[in-house]
Amino acid sequence: MAGGAFVSEGGGGGNSYEGGVTVFVIMTCIVAAMGGLLFGYDLGISGGVTSMEEFLSKFFPEVDKQMHEARRETAYCKFDNQLLQLFTSSLYLAALASSFVASAVTRKYGRKISMFVGGVAFLIGSLFNAFATNVAMLIVGRLLLGVGVGFANQSTPVYLSEMAPAKIRGALNIGFQMAITIGILIANLINYGTSQMAKNGWRVSLGLAAVPAVIMVIGSFVLPDTPNSMLERGKYEQAREMLQKIRGADNVDEEFQDLCDACEAAKKVDNPWKNIFQQAKYRPALVFCSAIPFFQQITGINVIMFYAPVLFKTLGFADDASLISAVITGAVNVVSTLVSIYAVDRYGRRILFLEGGIQMIVSQIVVGTLIGMKFGTTGSGTLTPATADWILAFICLYVAGFAWSWGPLGWLVPSEICPLEIRPAGQAINVSVNMFFTFLIGQFFLTMLCHMKFGLFYFFGGMVAVMTVFIYFLLPETKGVPIEEMGRVWKQHPFWKRYMPDDAVIGGGEENYVKEV
């Protein structure tokens, strides 16, 4: 035994249901995954906009003034302004609050309705921002964008996990993260283009957020609902027909029976929130739905994603160079997510988590050291082109490690481990914890950089080390395991089995899903 680590047996185990991978289910999941464009576009656009001089002079003149007059005593503090950070981070407070409402809507009315509400809110918010004349309009727009993100991030990963066959669930679910990374890259490219405009480039950047919102709204009309959601609302025949359609087979009796068993168990739960917090058998789901989004944000990734242009500018990159560097990291993000799509259902979740964690630790330490050697604690100094290239290279290495590990798996794993009766509540916890810590990082990163200086990168590297150990000892492999049979995986884990009663296991057969290594 190596530290109690577990892996899947036979590709993850689980019942082998009838049917295969149909074009219909792949196209459905691709359309649904476009919900990630909302989140990704916002992550990418805000940092570029807040580095544009016209935007700063109109809404945040104090930041613009101190940047030009170099009033601050250190380069680390160039952009340290709470109101400026509130523009970026306010979205995530709204997303946090709306995720709880989205949980109830998703359970009662289906996953599609949540996607529709999210798209409409994001559309209205993008218009507020594009036509903003004061900071109040900007903040209101950001709050509406947050409602959109909260609804989309709550419903889309659940939708993808429920539609996809178990053997390719990871790859299809990561389509959501892929859409996020594409949204970030598109936003970075748009920011670079609009920064060349003589006037109102920031309005174009913020207003184009309406495009992914429209895609989301249209998608919510054309997508079918999931069999799980139909069963929750008593539509048994429609659920069977949909299952036959997405699996491409008439004989879906075994899988349909497991879904019905899970649905019957769900009906016995009057209050999913009370159960997930109080019943021991839901302890693994509660821990991972809370810990994984916390760890995902404490990697520091969103520092790179929505403050990349500001960060590169702080380090001495010229205006164009800072935006181009953000485009480069965005492109690395997209390509590396493709690696995850290829590997997640072949090699499993654990190996990606562990390798990506080690890669991020090394990268953060090197970046912190390079910045410390050039700027020290005073913040005085300049980057040579060679040092700037090395910093950019290791930031790209860090982004790559995140993009094939904590990025996609941070959404995939929580969405595939919760039984139906607590699934909306579990995903709401996942989204709300994610948004809360995204808010904290967004609101205080520039202040942390001002006070912790290059040591901030050591802080993030240390946190990645902690979470890598957490994954090694506590996360079993979930590759290829049907969602309705996750109870069997927890039952055979050396730590989590103490919380799992015999009736927590759904599904026939005596398959072993995990084994010690």
From Swiss-Prot:
Notes on how activity is controlled: Inhibited by uncouplers such as 2,4-dinitrophenol and carbonyl cyanide-m-chlorophenyl-hydrazone.
InterPro entries: MFS_dom, MFS_STP/MST-like_plant, MFS_sugar_transport-like, MFS_trans_sf, STP/PLT_plant, Sugar/inositol_transpt, Sugar_transporter_CS
Pfam families: Sugar_tr (PF00083)
Keyword RNA-binding: no
Signal peptide span: none
Cellular compartment(s): Membrane
Activity vs pH: Optimum pH is 5.5.
Membrane topology: Multi-pass membrane protein
Single GO molecular function: symporter activity
Keywords assigned: Membrane, Sugar transport, Symport, Transmembrane, Transmembrane helix, Transport
Spans through the membrane: 19-39, 86-106, 120-140, 143-163, 170-190, 204-224, 292-312, 324-344, 351-371, 390-410, 429-449, 454-474
Main location (coarse class): membrane
Intervals, Cytoplasmic compartment: 1-18, 475-517
Tissue-specific expression: Pollen specific (at protein level).
Cellular component GO terms, alphabetical: membrane
Record family assignment: Belongs to the major facilitator superfamily. Sugar transporter (TC 2.A.1.1) family.
Annotated function: Mediates an active uptake of hexoses, probably by sugar/hydrogen symport. Mostly transports glucose, and barely galactose, xylose and mannose.
Classification via NCBIfam families: SP
The protein's name in its UniProt record: Sugar transport protein 9
